[in-house]
Amino acid sequence: MMLRDNYAQGADPSSPGHPARATHVIRDLIVSQNAQETIASYVTDMRALEEHMHKAFAGQITDGKDGKFNSVIRELSGLSEKHIAALDEIADRRKQGGQGIAEAIKGAASSVLGLGAAAIDLVRSEKLPKNLRDDYTAVSLATVGYLMLHTTAEALGDAEVSELALSHLRDYAKAVMTLFHAVPEAVVTFLGEEGFAVDSKVASKVNKTVDKVWY
């Protein structure tokens, strides 16, 4: 009776035993859990995408037909491998709902594949310019994915994931520009190998033109 009378007389709603306070605590817990699940879904999506990309880069390296551009592909493969390890570490440490990264990735794979098979199904033998074009497409997809993850983590107050996503975004932002500048040279090289008379200076000229467009 005394507890009921205190509420009736306007007890402080912020006090630990007040029903309103309990309601707020429960609501905050639910919101926090939903936020964690939202971030976790982005993390597993990016992990699935990185895995597909890494397999593609490995396939191109094994194929060994890209010659002087192999160093670019190896750098991409190294970045992807590093990203996978970092995403695995944070996902396994948090273990959403008792579910580790291996199980979560199974559910994320179909979602990521829906983003566009052409962007990530790169394990095939293609001519060099098309390989680099598809690499560029995949890395660009990963870049915007990390931008979304960084923004989501910032908005929901997850500093750890925010910083991780930003670090990976920086890696791929540089890689995108490296690929962008490699494509003209790859096209000119390919045309020369096909027997066309080409101006070897064109690649450098195109890159300078493109730099003006971007910057």
Cite the ranges covered by each PLM segment.
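Alpha-helical scaffold segments that form or flank carboxylate-/histidine-based iron centers
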Residues: 35-46, 66-86, 128-135, 160-172
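Acidic/histidine-rich alpha-helical segments that form the ligand environment
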Residues: 39-60, 108-161
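Carboxylate-rich helix-loop segments that flank metal/cofactor sites and access channels
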Residues: 15-26, 89-133, 195-206
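Preference for long, well-ordered alpha-helical segments
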Residues: 53, 135-215
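Conserved catalytic-core motifs characterized by acidic clusters
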Residues: 21-34, 55, 60, 189-193
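Conserved alpha-helical segments that form or flank metal/cofactor-binding pockets of metalloenzymes
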Residues: 67-110, 182
